[in-house]
Swiss-Prot record:
Keywords: ATP-binding, Cell shape, Cell wall biogenesis/degradation, Cytoplasm, Ligase, Magnesium, Manganese, Metal-binding, Nucleotide-binding, Peptidoglycan synthesis. The gene is ddl. Residues 120-314 form the ATP-grasp domain. Mg(2+) 1 binds at residues 267, 281. Its EC number is 6.3.2.4. This is D-alanine--D-alanine ligase.
């Protein structure tokens, strides 16, 4: 299955609550390949915002988002978008110009985290261990494996593991036949066999870590992330105390050096052969669905979903 970016000319606006202490525009859906995930995330968020006593207007974002925001004049924008135009720094940039406080990270940190090769370079520059990777363009016309197998193919700018493929030694795969479905460039990353860990960070503080145990599929792809029964979450992650602490410290380091804001989720692999920790990415707009990791770790840390949303709202600001 392919998930593509779609151009949507007009935003859809729906008033969810007419009274409250402040007016929040909950922006979700949008035009990215992660549209459906964003809409599912927004369902719980809108309930929490209403429970917290806010006046809430829901906006399914289209190209006229600036016009709609100018019309409704919210006090705060809750950025519940995933993927292109929301998670890549576009919406934060617009909100900076409009001087509307918003949740989640700003322009630079969002753009850096969303682009896999730039985030990898950032990790390297800040002495954060990360997997070897290269960029391959469609124009290169490569006919052989661009890296020794096993390796991972990742779209340069997609989230939710959309378009991610792992090419193992035994796979019947010819790179010459790869059709670059998500843009003219991909990241080719060395596959690291090991245990996968996720860390939730809120306002510069790591809340905890969990381990992903695969039940179905060979790697943590889109289907595995969002289908119940495909993966098991072990929370807290069953690790020796010093290694668990290192996970939290490394996550906070990534968050702070990238100048993130609000919630984020850092992803790591503990290599089976060397017991070495590798940072894979940081997600500045983590999911808020029933199967999402940040709310699960927050609950383990004693923060229920409504209080998590309240804490995120407190961080709303724009960059001047």
């Amino acid at each position: 299955m392919q998930y593509q970016t779609h151009w949507i000319e007009h935003s859809v606006v729906k008033i969810l609550s007419t009274t409250g202490k402040n007016h929040i525009a909950l922006v979700a859906g949008g035009m990215s390949a992660e549209r459906e995930v964003s809409l599912v995330s927004s369902e719980g968020v809108q309930q929490a915002l209403i429970a917290l006593g806010y006046k809430v207007t829901f906006i399914d974002m289209g190209a006229d988002i600036a016009v709609k925001l100018q019309e409704i004049k919210p006090d705060i924008v809750f950025n519940c978008l995933h993927g292109t135009y929301g998670e890549d720094g576009c919406l934060p940039g617009l909100l900076n110009i409009m001087r509307i406080p918003y949740t989640h990270s700003g322009v630079l940190s969002s753009a850096l985290a969303f682009n896999k090769i730039h985030s990898s370079s950032w990790f390297f520059a800040n002495s954060i261990n990360t997997a070897e990777s290269i960029v391959v363009s469609k124009s290169y016309n490569i006919n052989t494996d661009p890296m020794k197998r096993p390796y991972v193919i990742k779209p340069l700018t997609q989230g939710s593991s959309i378009g991610v493929e792992v090419i193992f030694e035994e796979d019947d795969f010819n790179f010459a036949d790869y059709d670059f479905p998500y843009g003219d460039q991909v990241v080719i990353e060395r596959y690291i066999k090991g245990r996968e860990f996720q860390v939730a960070v809120l306002n510069s503080k790591a809340l905890g870590a969990l381990e992903i145990k695969l039940i179905k599929n060979r790697f943590y792809d889109y289907e595995t992330k969002y289908t119940e029964g495909f993966a098991e979450h072990l929370c807290p992650a069953p690790l020796h105390a010093n290694l668990y602490e290192k996970l939290l410290i490394e996550s906070e380091k990534i968050y702070k050096t990238m100048n993130c804001k609000g919630p984020a989720r850092a992803e790591f692999i503990l290599e089976e052969q060397t017991n070495k920790l590798y940072a894979l990415e940081i997600n500045t707009h983590p999911g808020m669905t029933p199967l999402s990791i940040v709310p699960e770790i927050a609950a383990y840390a004693g923060i229920n979903f409504t209080n998590l949303i309240a804490e995120i709202i407190k961080t709303a600001s724009f960059e001047s």
